[in-house]
Amino acid sequence: MDMHCKADPFSAMHRHGGVNQLGGVFVNGRPLPDVVRQRIVELAHQGVRPCDISRQLRVSHGCVSKILGRYYETGSIKPGVIGGSKPKVATPKVVDKIADYKRQNPTMFAWEIRDRLLAEGICDNDTVPSVSSINRIIRTKVQQPFHPTPDGTPVSTPGHTLVPSTASPPVSSASNDPVGSYSINGILGIPRSNGEKRKRDEDGSDGSGPNGDSQSSVESLRKHLRADNFTQQQLEALDRVFERPSYPDVFQSAEHIKSEQASEYSLPALTPGLDEVKSSLSASGNADLGSNVSGPQSYPVVTESFASHLYLKQEPHEASLTPFTPSSLASSGLADIQPFQMALTVDASTPTYSSFTHHGPPYGQFGSQPLIAGRDMSSTTLPGYPPHVPPTGQGSYPTSTLAGMVPGTNVSVHHSVQPVECCSCLSSSKPCLFHCRTGSGSEFSGNPYSHPQYTTYNEAWRFSNPALLSSPYYYSATSRGSAPPTAATAYDRH
C-alpha cells in the first residue's frame, strides 16, 4: 500500500530514518507496520510473485521474503523471533536475593549463589541466571562504588549496594595524604583541613626549590606511613637496607668473606699439607719403585739360556740416559744359568743399570718368546717402556735399544769383544762360526741395522737423532778381518 509512502519521502527520511532502494520509507529499528504485512500476504494469496509485491509496495525483497516465510511456517504475521526470546532472568527479586547472599558472605562464589537460588526455590531451572549473569549482576548492580562525603559518611547510589566489610582498607582522610592534588581528596575536590595546610606549608619551607619540595614530601610521606607500623630499630634496619646499592660489587671485599672460609682455604693452612706430601714421597725413597724416580737405582741381572755356550760382554763407554725405573725382571729359576750376559756401564753422574740378558735361538738370532714363563713382557708396567709396544717383540730387544727407548737421548756405544770360549774354537781349526777372536777392538758388519721391530720404534718414538737405529756405527767391517761372509751374514741376520 502507498499510505505509508504518500508523505514526503524527504520529510519521512528525517522523521523516520530513511528511504529504501525502491523509494519506500522505513523506520530504523522498527518492524514493518501490520497493514503492510497484511497486504503482502493478500497479494501472495492472489498469486502475485514476491518480486512484483516488492515493486508495488516499495518494500525490499528481503523483507517480503522474510514475512512470507514466517507466515508459511507459523501462520503468523506478527513480528519477532521465531522461537521467541529468552525471558529476562535478572528480575528485581533475584537481584535482591543475590545482594542478600553477597552481604551475608562476601566471598561466596557465583555458582554457589546459583545453587542456593535453586535450593530455596527462588528460581527454577528455566529462570535461574547463569554464572556469568550472576557475576555481571554482582559487578554492576550489587557492588556500587562508594563516594565519601566531606564529613566521612559514604554516599551510595540508589540501588542494591553492599555495606563495606571491615577487611577492606578505609578511605584515607585528608590528613593522611600530604601529596596534594594527586591524592583522592584532591581529585574529588575535598577541601583539606587546617592542620593539613599547616603541615604542607612547613614541608614547603624546609625544601630548597621544586626538587627539595618533592623530596621532602616523599620523605614525610614515608615517615608518616611507617610510623605506626614499625619500631625505631626496624625503621633503622629498613633504612640501611634501602641505602645499600642494588647491584653487588664485582670485586668482593675481604669483609664479606666468612672468617672460617678464609682460614680454611688460606695459603698458610694449605702449606703443611704440601710439606707432608713431600716428606712422604722422600721417605718412601727406594722402597717403592713407582713412588720416587729421582734417585739412582741398580737392578739385578736378568739371565736366559742360549742353545750354545757363548759368553759375550758389551761395554758401552759413554752414555747419556734419562732415568727410568723398569721393574725387576730376575727370576730365581733363571738366575743360575748365565751363558750370555750384556753389561751396561755408564758414567757416575747417571744411574747405574744392570745388564738385561735375552735368550733366543743360536747364532745370535733373538726370538720373541717371553722371558718369564706364563707372563708376556707386554703386560709389564715399566715406566721407561712405551705403552704401545707390540707384544710379539717385547722380550727380544738388546740392551742398546732399551737404553735408546727414552726419547731425546744420544747414546754413544763402543762395543769390544772379550776373549770368548766356545766348543767350535777349541775343537776345530776352522774359523769359528761365532767370530770368536782373542783380540779386542774387533767390530762387525757395516750394513744398516734395519730390523722391522726397531723401525717401528723409530716411527713411534720419533727420535730426533735416528742414527742409533740406522747408522753403520752399530756394526762396522773395518776390523772384522778375513772373516767368511757366511759367518757375517749369519751373525747379522737379526
Curated annotation (Swiss-Prot):
UniProt-listed GO biological process terms: negative regulation of transcription by RNA polymerase II; nervous system development; positive regulation of transcription by RNA polymerase II; pronephros development; regulation of transcription by RNA polymerase II; segment polarity determination; sensory organ development
DNA-binding found in the keyword field: yes
Any one Gene Ontology cellular component term annotated for this protein: nucleus
DNA-binding positions: 15-141
Record Pfam families: PAX, Pax2_C
Tissue-specific expression: Expression becomes spatially localized at mid-gastrula stages and is localized to the nervous system (midbrain, hindbrain, spinal cord), sensory organs (optic vesicle and stalk, otic vesicle), visceral arches, developing excretory system (pronephros, pronephric duct, rectal diverticulum, proctodaeum) and thryoid gland. Splicing does not appear to be tissue-specific.
Residue ranges, compositional bias (Low complexity): 163-175
Chief site of localization: nucleus
Membrane-spanning parts: none
Alphabetized InterPro entries for the sequence: Homeodomain-like_sf, PAIRED_DNA-bd_dom, Paired_dom, Pax2_C, PAX_fam, WH-like_DNA-bd_sf
UniProt keyword terms in alphabetical order: Developmental protein, DNA-binding, Nucleus, Paired box, Segmentation polarity protein, Transcription, Transcription regulation
Region (PAI subdomain): 18-74
Annotated region (Disordered), positions in chain: 142-221
Region (RED subdomain): 93-141
Gene Ontology MF annotations: DNA binding; DNA-binding transcription factor activity, RNA polymerase II-specific; RNA polymerase II cis-regulatory region sequence-specific DNA binding
Purpose: Probable transcription factor. Involved in kidney development, acting synergistically with lhx1/lim-1 in pronephric morphogenesis during the tailbud stages.
Name of protein: Paired box protein Pax-2-B
Protein's organism: Xenopus laevis (African clawed frog)
Lineage: Eukaryota, Metazoa, Chordata, Craniata, Vertebrata
Gene behind the chain: pax2-b
